[in-house]
Amino acid sequence: MAGEITMELDNYVEQVQAIRQNCLKLTTVVEKCDQILATLDAYQQRKLPKCELTELELSTDLIFDNLIGYPQLMDVSAQFENLRQVMIENFGIWHICNQLWIDDLQTFCGPNSCNLEIMAGNAVISANLKNTIATDNLDWQGQDNERPCPWTAMEKLDAVTAVRKYYSHVDNIIMAWAPDSGDVDWQVLQFLRQNHFQGNLIVIGERNGATNSAKFWQNARLQLIDQLNQHHRPFDFINDQVWLVK
């Protein structure tokens, strides 16, 4: 059933803690456990983790070199990679960011910039980026998470309406993890082109993958932003990156 929690937070934390305890001699596994636990602890407090997640999948060499002593390693990567679903179901957060990345984003946008976040979800980015208007029509409610709980004040607007209202007043528009159904993202990009938007459209998503519409990726002029990808690295099977889009 949509919105039903299948990945209980407490159960997942216990699983990761058990993996850590059983693999104390495997430094790589312990480090990954610590990253996951620190991320969950921070988000429970409505704070951002201080450091980014690194790739959670265990290497084939590590698994097979230690398989006799640690047969459970065959299942550990899958358990680690459940993190995003845990975040979605328990926090309503699809895009997992960290404080280092937010600092990079703030530097890129500028200390005095005015910003708009569309399809903001629970507005984690807006809550941590200065002078940012958070907007979302909350039509994702019930899709793995029943209860929107924004981190900051949010104006209930769909993406196109929000862009029409604010594009001439902001320097940066941020769109993170837009859904791959519909073509609202493409409508937004068309509107900005037609109205000669002079600011930056910053998109966080997986090209031709889990986020955004096919039409958007087919028509977007994309530039990877090194500054915004140094502390934003794919950690699971979804290769999301930060793009400047024209």
Per-range role (PLM):
Residues 1-98:
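N-terminal accessory regions of S-adenosyl-L-methionine
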Residues 91-111:
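A short, well-structured juxtamembrane/interface segment
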Residues 107-113, 164-171, 194-196:
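Flexible, charged surface loops at secondary-structure boundaries
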Residues 112-121:
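Conserved class I S-adenosyl-L-methionine
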Residues 122-132:
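Conserved SAM-binding loop of SAM-dependent methyltransferases across substrates and taxa
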Residues 135-169:
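S-adenosyl-L-methionine
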Residues 170-185:
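A short SAM/SAH-binding and catalytic strip from SAM-dependent methyltransferases
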Residues 182-246:
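C-terminal substrate-binding/active-site "lid" region of AdoMet-derived donor-dependent transferases
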